Amino acid sequence: MTLYNEKMIPILDDLENPEIELAGGSTVGMLLSVTNSLIKYICNKTLGKKKYENVQEEVLKIKEEANNLKKYALSIIDEDRVVLDEILKTYRLKKEEPKLYEEACKNGVDFCLEVTKKAVCTLKLVDRLEKVGNR
């Protein structure tokens, strides 16, 4: 039987490996996807329970939103690498092509802002679920 900690070791090794340039947003994507999975777990523990039948509709909405946020979070794990690569590539050319570098940096900031907004959405789901979810 494989334990979960054994499954995590390769991921953590990649994060520590200087040969693999994972950007910080990749880690944020991992954490957001785990957080949204935990939200879905609590929803699943709440749904179908007689004690919580008056909040089933709200819990279903929360679960659906958490699922969408989880999908987004998984996508940013790799997308963050693409954004960082573009910044690094244009950084080397910033004297010859300053506009390209500026655009890459702007895209990086826009990406970070979008990720931050999704993280806030996740926090809001936690707040909503805390009020109605399984205790």
Model-derived features: positions:
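Phosphate-handling active-site elements
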Residues: L38-E57
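A structural-propensity feature for long, helix-poor, extended segments
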Residues: K51-I87
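Residue-level recognition of alpha-helical structural elements
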Residues: A23, T27, V55, I62, ...
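Conserved phosphate/anionic-ligand binding catalytic regions in large, soluble enzymes, centered on
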Residues: N17-K40, R135
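Amphipathic, well-ordered alpha-helical segments in soluble domains
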Residues: K7, I11, V34-Y41, I76-E79, ...
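Amphipathic alpha-helical interface segments
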Residues: D80-R135
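Amphipathic alpha-helix face/heptad-repeat signature
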Residues: T27-V34, I62, L69-I76, G108-T122
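Short, hydrophobic/aliphatic alpha-helical segments
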Residues: L3-I20, N134
